[in-house]
Swiss-Prot record:
One of its GO terms (molecular function) is RNA binding. Pfam families: RrnaAD. Its main location: cytoplasm. This is Ribosomal RNA small subunit methyltransferase A. PANTHER family: DIMETHYLADENOSINE TRANSFERASE, DIMETHYLADENOSINE TRANSFERASE-RELATED. One of its GO terms (cellular component) is cytosol. NCBIfam families: ksgA. It comes from the Bacteria.
Length: 293
């Protein structure tokens, strides 16, 4: 029996009942899959390593499975939901399953790709979410860009996306998402999630990805990103090309690209997949600027 001061998590019966009440069918368009296993939810929250001082932002709370567990471990939870029916039902669910914790919940009815600092009552320190699978990487990067206060991330994504995000330089799956995510700090796999904990059950496995934001040798601001991101994009646009060839468009010519690469102490004959984020930042020439400002 749950303590009255805590939250009663949602199981398969409650998830189906809520969906029927709201006439909600999880849609592929919105990347919706609802977690209906309390043990999985507890595991996600434990992996996030939240403290009682953390202010969590959750993207895509759905019917509230993860949200209910998060409020037990954090100072507050802001749920960003694009579906008005789901957003309207969340407070009702909290009155039913966690009335003593309902004051910790805030809801933002908005597309997560458009959410801004001004939408938040409290700036988040952690992002914990079962991300909509069709936009998981863009949402992850947007949240890290928009909220410099986020210092820890634990997200559930498709297993192959999790592998790509946490890939090391030189591997076949290392690419643009890997480099851009590591711009903020180390990216690691934090576990696997089976198909049967979801409704409806997806066709593929899921994975947990953890990012711990670190104080880097470069500024994690818009000005820096605008210099680094285009170089990363250009380097991976045609993976089989050498950096000299791949970056010739960015720098204006192959010769100019080679000069920039050599100035950054990078072999022009390498391919983009061989460089880590530090190399790309150095190539963008923004390391020195941080010290000057």
């Amino acid at each position: 029996m749950e303590e009255p001061s805590g939250a009663q998590l949602l199981g398969p019966v409650e998830i189906r009942a809520l969906a029927e009440k709201l006439d909600v069918t999880p849609t592929k368009k919105l990347g919706q899959n609802f977690v209906h296993d309390p043990n999985t939810v507890r595991r996600i929250v434990a992996a996030a390593e939240l403290t009682p001082d953390d202010h969590v932002v959750e993207v895509g709370p759905g019917l509230g499975s993860l949200t209910l567990a998060l409020v037990e471990s954090a100072a507050s939870v802001t749920a960003v939901e694009i579906d008005p029916r789901l957003a309207a039902e969340l407070p009702e669910t909290f009155q039913w399953r966690a009335p003593a914790l309902a004051h910790k919940l805030s809801i933002v009815l908005k597309d997560a790709l458009k959410v801004q600092q001004s939408d938040m009552e409290v700036q988040p320190t952690a992002l914990v979410a079962n991300l909509p699978y069709n936009v998981s990487v863009p949402v992850l990067l947007h949240m890290l860009e928009e909220f410099p206060t986020i210092n820890k991330v634990l997200v559930m994504v498709q297993a192959e996306v999790a592998d790509r995000l946490a890939a090391d330089p030189g591997s076949k799956i290392y690419g643009v998402p890997s480099v851009k995510a590591s711009f903020y700090g180390p990216v690691t796999r934090a576990g696997s999630i089976g198909k049967n904990v979801f409704w409806p059950a997806p066709k593929i496995e899921s994975g947990l990805v953890k990012i711990v934001r670190e104080d880097t040798a470069w500024k994690q601001d818009d000005e820096t990103r605008k210099k680094v991101w285009p170089i990363i994009d250009a380097a991976f646009l045609q993976r089989r090309k050498t950096l000299r060839a791949a970056l010739s468009g960015h720098y204006g010519s192959g010769q100019a690209a080679e000069e920039a690469l050599r100035a950054a102490d990078i072999d022009p004959t390498l391919r983009g997949e061989k460089l880590d984020v530090t190399d790309y930042v150095r190539l963008a020439g923004v390391l020195q600027q941080k010290d000057e400002k």
